[in-house]
Curated annotation (Swiss-Prot):
Residues 61-100 are annotated as: Disordered. This is EKC/KEOPS complex subunit GON7. GO terms for biological process: tRNA threonylcarbamoyladenosine modification. The gene is GON7. It is found in: Nucleus.
Length: 100
């Protein structure tokens, strides 16, 4: 048994990934599969690591003054909307209207 994968880069050049999942001797075939999946994961990590590092460096160079915490919203806007939360734990905080 083997795992196959193919990555097509930005230039359109395909790169094939192949890992054998044979268990040594009469070993458990699922152990062989688990080992193959771990090997494939390592191969994919090695393949994408330079691409990810290049993307991170590109983003840092493009926006050196911005905080790269992943929060795209304005923090001041978040502070202004603290009291606008919905209470799902109980009844509405509004008083019911009394008949007049």
């Amino acid at each position: 048994m083997e795992l196959l994968g193919e990555y097509v880069g930005q230039e359109g050049k395909p790169q094939k990934l192949r890992v054998s999942c044979e268990a040594p001797g009469d070993g458990d075939p699922f152990q062989g599969l688990l080992s193959g999946v771990a090997q494939m994961k390592d191969m994919v990590t090695e393949l994408f690591d330079p691409l990810v590092q290049g993307e991170v460096q590109h983003r840092v160079a493009a926006a050196p003054d911005e905080d790269l915490d992943g929060d795209d919203e304005d923090d001041a806007e978040d502070e202004n909307n603290i009291d606008n939360r919905t209470n799902f734990d109980g009844p509405s905080a509004k008083r019911p209207k009394t008949p007049s």
